[in-house]
Amino acid sequence: GLLETGAEVVAIEIDEVLANQLPDTVAERMPGAVERLEVVLSDALDVKVIPGAEPTALVANLPYNVAVPVLLHMLAICPQWSTGVVMVQSEVADRLVAAPGSKIYGVPSAKLAWYAEAIRVGNVPPTVFWPVPNVDSGLVRITRRRPPHVDGRDPRVTRSQVFRVVDAAFASRRKMLRSALAGLCGGSMAASELITAAGIDPTARGEALDIGDLARVVEALAQAGALSDSGQV
């Protein structure tokens, strides 16, 4: 387990019974490790600050119904953690690691790519759980990286701006980018001009663009004043 490595562990658990039991279980099986464990009783999406020393890694069995929002939230509030392994439903694992051009590449793939590289590193059969679920699970390894470069430099855009454009680009997979972003740009003609200025084909679809391409589009829109931002990073 994590405590056996000598690491300090912060465990986030929404179930009060499990959260209360965990310290007792550790005290019974690894008495010397109790002081290195802190349990936070909370919905992970409500956590704003991780107590104690800044965490450097994430290891999680994510709730399958909210796996993507929880993962993105943890990446946002813990900019210092550099690596992680998460278990999610098999189909979600495929979407998280999907590459541009694939049928399952979408919002989760692009948003995760803003933060990190992700690869699928294993399968977990339902038979290892009790009770046995009717879904397969997958393990995804995440390695944080800097946001993608735009023309060899860091993009002059914020995460919130990028995510707004990602949401718009994938809202309708059949739409060309100029149509998908028309609402942000004041029309498809303006969108086409700005997308072209970014060096991207305005007739392309969002599913064909990697996060670097999308960041270039966002920068062009932001420079033209097409995106207002609250200052989030």
Question: What residue ranges belong to the model's regions?
Answer:
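Catalytic cores of RNA-modifying enzymes
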Residues: 1-165, 196, 207, 216-219, ...
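C-terminal lobe and adjacent flexible extensions of AdoMet/dcAdoMet transferase-like proteins
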Residues: 167-233
